[in-house]
Amino acid sequence: MDKLIIGGVEIKNRLFVGSGKYPSNEIIKDVLEGSGSQVITLALRRVDLDNKEEDILQNIPKDVILLPNTSGATNAEEAIRIARIARAMGCGNWIKIEVISDSKYLLPDNEETIKATKVLADEGFIVLPYMCPDLYAGRRLIEAGAAAVMPLGAPIGSNRGLKTKELIQIMIDELDIPIIVDAGIGKPSQAMEAMEMGAAACLVNTAIASSEDPINMARAFKMAVEGGRLAYEAKMGRESKFGNASSPLTGFLD
Protein backbone atom coordinates (compact mmCIF):
# COMPACT_ATOMS: atom_id res chain seq x y z
CA MET A 1 0.00 0.00 0.00
CA ASP A 2 1.49 3.32 -1.08
CA LYS A 3 1.97 5.98 1.56
CA LEU A 4 1.04 9.61 1.01
CA ILE A 5 3.98 11.77 2.06
CA ILE A 6 3.75 15.56 1.76
CA GLY A 7 6.43 17.82 3.15
CA GLY A 8 7.98 14.90 4.98
CA VAL A 9 4.70 14.12 6.79
CA GLU A 10 2.78 10.89 6.28
CA ILE A 11 -0.89 11.61 5.62
CA LYS A 12 -2.90 8.54 6.59
CA ASN A 13 -6.34 10.02 5.95
CA ARG A 14 -6.69 11.04 2.31
CA LEU A 15 -9.69 13.31 2.86
CA PHE A 16 -8.75 16.96 3.34
CA VAL A 17 -11.51 19.31 4.47
CA GLY A 18 -12.18 23.02 4.25
CA SER A 19 -13.38 25.31 7.01
CA GLY A 20 -15.72 27.70 5.20
CA LYS A 21 -19.52 27.92 4.85
CA TYR A 22 -20.37 26.07 8.06
CA PRO A 23 -23.27 27.36 10.17
CA SER A 24 -20.82 27.95 13.03
CA ASN A 25 -17.14 27.57 13.85
CA GLU A 26 -18.00 25.18 16.66
CA ILE A 27 -19.18 22.46 14.28
CA ILE A 28 -15.77 22.28 12.62
CA LYS A 29 -14.29 20.24 15.47
CA ASP A 30 -17.05 17.63 15.08
CA VAL A 31 -16.60 17.58 11.30
CA LEU A 32 -12.90 16.92 11.76
CA GLU A 33 -13.68 14.09 14.14
CA GLY A 34 -16.24 12.60 11.76
CA SER A 35 -14.00 12.86 8.74
CA GLY A 36 -10.82 11.86 10.52
CA SER A 37 -9.04 14.47 8.41
CA GLN A 38 -5.46 15.38 9.22
CA VAL A 39 -5.45 18.51 7.04
CA ILE A 40 -7.82 21.48 7.01
CA THR A 41 -7.73 24.55 4.79
CA LEU A 42 -8.58 27.99 6.10
CA ALA A 43 -8.73 31.54 4.85
CA LEU A 44 -6.42 33.86 6.74
CA ARG A 45 -9.20 36.37 7.37
CA ARG A 46 -10.88 33.80 9.63
CA VAL A 47 -7.92 33.72 12.00
CA ASP A 48 -8.43 36.32 14.75
CA LEU A 49 -5.81 35.98 17.46
CA ASP A 50 -7.27 38.93 19.37
CA ASN A 51 -10.78 37.50 19.60
CA LYS A 52 -10.93 33.87 20.65
CA GLU A 53 -14.68 33.66 20.14
CA GLU A 54 -14.27 34.47 16.45
CA ASP A 55 -10.92 32.72 15.95
CA ILE A 56 -11.41 29.57 13.93
CA LEU A 57 -8.20 28.10 15.34
CA GLN A 58 -9.95 27.58 18.68
CA ASN A 59 -12.00 24.81 17.06
CA ILE A 60 -9.17 22.99 15.29
CA PRO A 61 -7.24 20.36 17.30
CA LYS A 62 -3.51 20.97 17.60
CA ASP A 63 -2.62 17.74 15.80
CA VAL A 64 -4.45 18.79 12.61
CA ILE A 65 -2.24 20.30 9.91
CA LEU A 66 -3.25 23.84 8.98
CA LEU A 67 -3.30 24.57 5.26
CA PRO A 68 -3.88 28.32 4.97
CA ASN A 69 -4.95 29.45 1.53
CA THR A 70 -4.24 32.68 -0.27
CA SER A 71 -7.91 33.37 -0.94
CA GLY A 72 -8.38 36.90 -2.23
CA ALA A 73 -5.09 37.00 -4.13
CA THR A 74 -5.43 38.08 -7.75
CA ASN A 75 -1.76 37.80 -8.67
CA ALA A 76 1.45 36.12 -7.53
CA GLU A 77 2.63 39.08 -5.46
CA GLU A 78 -0.56 39.13 -3.37
CA ALA A 79 -0.42 35.37 -2.84
CA ILE A 80 3.19 35.59 -1.67
CA ARG A 81 2.34 38.35 0.77
CA ILE A 82 -0.62 36.44 2.24
CA ALA A 83 1.51 33.30 2.64
CA ARG A 84 4.18 35.20 4.54
CA ILE A 85 1.57 36.74 6.83
CA ALA A 86 0.08 33.30 7.53
CA ARG A 87 3.44 31.92 8.60
CA ALA A 88 4.17 34.98 10.73
CA MET A 89 0.82 34.46 12.50
CA GLY A 90 1.83 30.94 13.51
CA CYS A 91 -0.12 28.97 10.92
CA GLY A 92 2.91 26.90 9.92
CA ASN A 93 4.68 26.55 6.60
CA TRP A 94 2.05 24.69 4.60
CA ILE A 95 0.29 26.94 2.09
CA LYS A 96 -2.38 26.40 -0.54
CA ILE A 97 -1.81 28.84 -3.37
CA GLU A 98 -5.02 30.32 -4.77
CA VAL A 99 -4.63 33.04 -7.38
CA ILE A 100 -7.99 33.99 -8.87
CA SER A 101 -8.72 37.10 -10.89
CA ASP A 102 -11.80 35.66 -12.62
CA SER A 103 -14.81 36.71 -10.52
CA LYS A 104 -17.43 34.79 -12.52
CA TYR A 105 -16.12 31.23 -12.68
CA LEU A 106 -13.42 31.57 -10.00
CA LEU A 107 -10.89 29.71 -12.12
CA PRO A 108 -7.29 29.80 -10.89
CA ASP A 109 -4.59 31.59 -12.90
CA ASN A 110 -1.98 28.92 -13.58
CA GLU A 111 0.73 31.34 -14.72
CA GLU A 112 0.56 33.50 -11.60
CA THR A 113 0.28 30.35 -9.47
CA ILE A 114 3.55 29.02 -10.91
CA LYS A 115 5.30 32.30 -10.11
CA ALA A 116 4.08 32.28 -6.51
CA THR A 117 4.97 28.61 -6.05
CA LYS A 118 8.59 29.19 -7.08
CA VAL A 119 9.11 32.07 -4.64
CA LEU A 120 7.40 30.40 -1.69
CA ALA A 121 9.02 26.99 -2.22
CA ASP A 122 12.41 28.72 -2.24
CA GLU A 123 11.45 30.29 1.10
CA GLY A 124 10.79 26.90 2.67
CA PHE A 125 7.02 26.68 2.35
CA ILE A 126 5.28 23.38 1.66
CA VAL A 127 3.34 24.57 -1.38
CA LEU A 128 0.12 22.96 -2.60
CA PRO A 129 -1.10 24.99 -5.59
CA TYR A 130 -4.74 25.04 -6.66
CA MET A 131 -4.84 24.92 -10.45
CA CYS A 132 -6.81 24.35 -13.61
CA PRO A 133 -5.91 20.79 -14.67
CA ASP A 134 -3.20 20.97 -17.31
CA LEU A 135 -0.28 18.60 -17.80
CA TYR A 136 2.22 21.27 -18.83
CA ALA A 137 1.32 23.58 -15.96
CA GLY A 138 1.62 20.61 -13.62
CA ARG A 139 5.14 19.92 -14.84
CA ARG A 140 6.11 23.56 -14.35
CA LEU A 141 4.68 23.54 -10.83
CA ILE A 142 6.80 20.52 -10.00
CA GLU A 143 9.86 22.33 -11.36
CA ALA A 144 8.89 25.34 -9.23
CA GLY A 145 8.93 23.21 -6.09
CA ALA A 146 5.30 22.22 -5.45
CA ALA A 147 4.86 19.43 -2.88
CA ALA A 148 1.58 18.37 -4.51
CA VAL A 149 -0.80 19.85 -7.06
CA MET A 150 -4.52 20.43 -6.62
CA PRO A 151 -6.45 20.43 -9.91
CA LEU A 152 -10.11 21.40 -9.81
CA GLY A 153 -12.86 18.94 -10.64
CA ALA A 154 -15.33 21.73 -11.38
CA PRO A 155 -15.62 25.42 -10.46
CA ILE A 156 -15.13 25.98 -6.74
CA GLY A 157 -18.28 25.65 -4.67
CA SER A 158 -20.34 24.29 -7.58
CA ASN A 159 -20.87 20.70 -6.31
CA ARG A 160 -20.89 19.61 -9.97
CA GLY A 161 -18.43 16.73 -9.70
CA LEU A 162 -15.55 15.67 -11.91
CA LYS A 163 -16.16 17.74 -15.03
CA THR A 164 -12.42 17.71 -15.76
CA LYS A 165 -12.03 13.98 -15.21
CA GLU A 166 -10.01 13.18 -18.33
CA LEU A 167 -7.55 16.02 -17.77
CA ILE A 168 -7.05 14.98 -14.15
CA GLN A 169 -6.49 11.37 -15.24
CA ILE A 170 -3.71 12.50 -17.57
CA MET A 171 -2.04 14.32 -14.70
CA ILE A 172 -2.34 11.27 -12.43
CA ASP A 173 -0.83 9.05 -15.12
CA GLU A 174 2.02 11.36 -16.10
CA LEU A 175 3.12 13.32 -13.02
CA ASP A 176 5.22 11.86 -10.23
CA ILE A 177 3.67 13.98 -7.49
CA PRO A 178 0.53 13.68 -5.33
CA ILE A 179 -2.56 14.81 -7.23
CA ILE A 180 -5.20 16.13 -4.82
CA VAL A 181 -8.57 16.75 -6.46
CA ASP A 182 -9.89 20.05 -5.16
CA ALA A 183 -13.10 21.98 -5.85
CA GLY A 184 -16.38 20.88 -7.37
CA ILE A 185 -16.80 17.51 -5.66
CA GLY A 186 -20.42 17.46 -4.53
CA LYS A 187 -21.13 13.86 -3.51
CA PRO A 188 -19.26 11.07 -1.73
CA SER A 189 -19.61 8.97 -4.89
CA GLN A 190 -17.67 11.62 -6.82
CA ALA A 191 -14.87 11.57 -4.27
CA MET A 192 -14.78 7.78 -4.55
CA GLU A 193 -14.53 8.08 -8.33
CA ALA A 194 -11.57 10.45 -8.01
CA MET A 195 -9.81 8.04 -5.68
CA GLU A 196 -10.54 5.07 -7.97
CA MET A 197 -8.78 7.03 -10.72
CA GLY A 198 -5.64 7.16 -8.61
CA ALA A 199 -5.88 10.58 -7.01
CA ALA A 200 -3.72 10.83 -3.91
CA ALA A 201 -6.42 12.65 -1.94
CA CYS A 202 -9.53 14.81 -2.21
CA LEU A 203 -10.27 18.17 -0.64
CA VAL A 204 -13.95 18.73 0.14
CA ASN A 205 -15.59 21.78 1.67
CA THR A 206 -18.89 22.96 0.18
CA ALA A 207 -20.41 19.49 -0.20
CA ILE A 208 -19.96 18.86 3.52
CA ALA A 209 -20.66 22.34 4.84
CA SER A 210 -23.80 22.92 2.74
CA SER A 211 -25.40 19.57 3.59
CA GLU A 212 -28.21 19.32 6.14
CA ASP A 213 -26.01 17.16 8.39
CA PRO A 214 -22.35 18.13 7.94
CA ILE A 215 -21.07 15.69 10.56
CA ASN A 216 -22.62 12.63 8.94
CA MET A 217 -21.71 13.93 5.49
CA ALA A 218 -18.11 14.16 6.66
CA ARG A 219 -18.33 10.51 7.74
CA ALA A 220 -19.79 9.57 4.37
CA PHE A 221 -16.94 11.28 2.53
CA LYS A 222 -14.41 9.56 4.77
CA MET A 223 -15.79 6.14 3.84
CA ALA A 224 -16.00 7.06 0.17
CA VAL A 225 -12.38 8.19 0.01
CA GLU A 226 -11.21 5.10 1.86
CA GLY A 227 -13.25 2.82 -0.40
CA GLY A 228 -12.06 4.51 -3.57
CA ARG A 229 -8.43 4.26 -2.56
CA LEU A 230 -8.82 0.60 -1.58
CA ALA A 231 -10.43 -0.15 -4.95
CA TYR A 232 -7.58 1.60 -6.77
CA GLU A 233 -4.97 -0.39 -4.87
CA ALA A 234 -6.89 -3.64 -5.49
CA LYS A 235 -6.54 -3.09 -9.28
CA MET A 236 -10.08 -3.21 -10.65
CA GLY A 237 -11.04 -5.70 -13.36
CA ARG A 238 -11.06 -4.66 -17.00
CA GLU A 239 -14.21 -3.47 -18.71
CA SER A 240 -15.62 -5.37 -21.68
CA LYS A 241 -18.30 -4.50 -24.20
CA PHE A 242 -19.34 -8.17 -24.32
CA GLY A 243 -20.93 -10.39 -21.71
CA ASN A 244 -18.61 -12.72 -19.80
CA ALA A 245 -20.37 -15.32 -17.66
CA SER A 246 -19.11 -15.86 -14.14
CA SER A 247 -20.39 -19.46 -14.18
CA PRO A 248 -20.08 -22.14 -16.93
CA LEU A 249 -22.87 -21.94 -19.51
CA THR A 250 -22.46 -25.51 -20.80
CA GLY A 251 -22.20 -28.99 -19.39
CA PHE A 252 -24.72 -28.84 -16.54
CA LEU A 253 -27.62 -30.54 -18.39
CA ASP A 254 -25.52 -32.72 -20.71
Curated annotation (Swiss-Prot):
Enzyme Commission identifier(s): 2.8.1.10
GO terms of molecular function: thiazole synthase activity
Subcellular location: Cytoplasm
Example of a GO biological process term: thiamine diphosphate biosynthetic process
SUPFAM superfamilies: ThiG-like (SSF110399)
GO cellular component, one term: cytoplasm
Pathway info: Cofactor biosynthesis; thiamine diphosphate biosynthesis
Signal peptide: none
Active site per the UniProt annotation: K96
Keyword vocabulary terms for this entry: Cytoplasm, Schiff base, Thiamine biosynthesis, Transferase
UniProt catalytic activity: [ThiS sulfur-carrier protein]-C-terminal-Gly-aminoethanethioate + 2-iminoacetate + 1-deoxy-D-xylulose 5-phosphate = [ThiS sulfur-carrier protein]-C-terminal Gly-Gly + 2-[(2R,5Z)-2-carboxy-4-methylthiazol-5(2H)-ylidene]ethyl phosphate + 2 H2O + H(+)
Record: residues binding 1-deoxy-D-xylulose 5-phosphate: G157, A183, G184, N205, T206
Family named by the database record: Belongs to the ThiG family.
Functional summary from the UniProt entry: Catalyzes the rearrangement of 1-deoxy-D-xylulose 5-phosphate (DXP) to produce the thiazole phosphate moiety of thiamine. Sulfur is provided by the thiocarboxylate moiety of the carrier protein ThiS. In vitro, sulfur can be provided by H(2)S.
Assembly behavior: Homotetramer. Forms heterodimers with either ThiH or ThiS.
Protein name, as recorded: Thiazole synthase
